């Protein structure tokens, strides 16, 4: 399984009054990993939507919280494609504190490819699938 991994610190804006990461901030980590995955395969978000003439709205977001993180923890966020559908793809994420084997959080996001003018589902562009295929869990 080929995963794409980023490193990110838990920042002041990520923590809540209890001094641990606010659960919603895991979505920030997921979004950074997703964006950097796309950039790494030549599909930077600053260009991909215009080039392919599509949008990729998220229609499902799920995550499980396993262990707390605190300010300045360095985390590793891994992402891979768990599924290509006809009009959608599912990205799976795992969050670990750097150097520790225990899972801190994991989850998935489903993106649907839609026509930019009608906002109706359309097949995933072949270029998108081909470029992300190395990160598909088989």
Show where each model-derived region lies:
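HotDog/MaoC-like acyl-thioester-processing domains
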Residues: 2-6, 65, 69-74, 82-138
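Residue-level signal for functionally critical sites in structured catalytic/ligand-binding pockets
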Residues: 11-16, 23-27, 31-34, 61, ...
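Short glycine/proline-centered loop/turn elements that form peptide/ligand docking sites
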Residues: 43-45, 57-61, 65-66, 80-87
């Amino acid at each position: 399984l080929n995963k794409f991994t980023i490193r990110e610190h838990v920042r002041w804006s990520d923590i809540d009054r209890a001094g641990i990461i606010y659960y919603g901030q895991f979505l920030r980590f997921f979004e950074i990993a997703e964006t950097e995955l796309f950039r790494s395969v030549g599909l930077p978000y600053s260009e991909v939507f215009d080039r392919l003439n599509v949008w990729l709205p998220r229609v499902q977001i799920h995550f499980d919280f396993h262990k707390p993180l605190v300010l300045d923890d360095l985390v590793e966020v891994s992402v891979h494609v768990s599924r290509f559908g006809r009009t959608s793809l599912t990205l799976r994420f795992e969050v670990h504190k750097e150097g520790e084997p225990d899972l801190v959080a994991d989850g998935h996001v489903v993106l649907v490819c839609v026509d930019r003018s009608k906002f109706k589902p359309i097949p995933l562009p072949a270029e998108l699938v081909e470029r992300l295929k190395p990160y598909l869990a088989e």
